[in-house]
């Protein structure tokens, strides 16, 4: 407002100028600073070393890819101002002339070549290396298994402003995949100078709307506006702080005390109704392309027996968990992929129509066939990462499995970073998990279950499933692709690879002083450049 008012009064007399000065001073009293709870300490700020939502929430503001998602979840130009394609296979991206790194140097096509090659390089060890393969970028699969060098990846700088990407198959939704954290560029010179320490505030060079200012591990990350960002004139928040509060109860209590402006996206049931009554206008509940489920270690005995996995799946009362315990608008999940995703709307599996008692009896019969009974009950550990809500749900789930199918379940708690490591290493039986879409299309979920996917911590391996997703790529239209996705989802259910529980909502508290949040993006990105602090009336 101050800039607009100042320009409109140029040429007026001293009194007008004095009036504007006083108005500007009043406006400046509104500090454009914001505090957001991010729910956990991040594992890293290197986009090629992370896989979780807390990390993406921060990196989203520090680095910008070829495109980003707007307030409605649509892909819009980021570093790339335009693009074209030939049969959805060869893509040409034209970069902005004014796209710059936070040190003032230009962002070029070669930066994306370097970054994507780094992502594909097995030496990087990225948990998201398979994303390039899922996007069907030429030679990505061979590079990931060491058969070809990273330089063979199908990405090429035609000149400083034009990037060519070649795919092995047509991918109509390829552009929508490019806003993902792993596809953002990293600064080659910063990495060469500082190695793994390039993400420290004193070394960080980014190209996003904000730059890393301070990082106190297990406490806070502070970012400030990047004056070199191409659209900096439309950013209003000057400084943002991300807190690492894992306790949802502490999160809401600190929100109520005024310390936090935007809470994390999960409100504990014990406080949800209280917030509905006390502050209904500050409570935002929106659909979220995220599935809460229990992950089963498919390669570990006895869970390599599909009868055991199906019994665990059928023995959980997901309806009670969803509608009575959490009860914030979540939808009961009978499959992995949310039914409201683009090209979704999947048919429910047959067991979804069984009564609870019918499901439990079927589960007991399966366990009996697998050699389990009252004298020899199924025993397993349930791993969950630190969180009040995760703990409560784990206690409830363990109780249900004991009551409904006679299983003996012990609880195992680990911090976020440690739990991720345990799951990747296969050091678990059953684990609490949430998978959130990387883009709005069923493959954002289904690809995770591919046998060679680097995110596949269930260790599910079915060549027939892999073949279905390969077949979907050559489907002639969205309707044909949807039918194949339905078959893939049905196969996941038949194999009982996971225990789906519910499709999440984003439930968060937002102070009335914060504007710019619309909540229409089902990916629920925490994009600070959209926000601003209201001026007092």
Predicted regions mapped to residue ranges:
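Structural transition elements
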Residues: 331-369, 387-392
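Extracellular/periplasmic solute-recognition and catalytic clefts
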Residues: 213-224, 241-300, 323
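Extracytoplasmic/peripheral linker and loop segments enriched in polar/acidic and small residues
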Residues: 92, 356-357, 407-424, 444-512, ...
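Gly/Pro-rich hinge or "lid" segments in bacterial periplasmic/extracellular proteins
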Residues: 74, 141, 146, 150-152, ...
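Alpha-helical secondary-structure segments
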Residues: 108-115, 160-166, 170, 208-209, ...
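N-terminal lobe/hinge region of extracytoplasmic solute-binding protein
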Residues: 37-87, 203-206
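Long beta-strand-rich cores associated with HINT superfamily self-processing modules
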Residues: 508-537
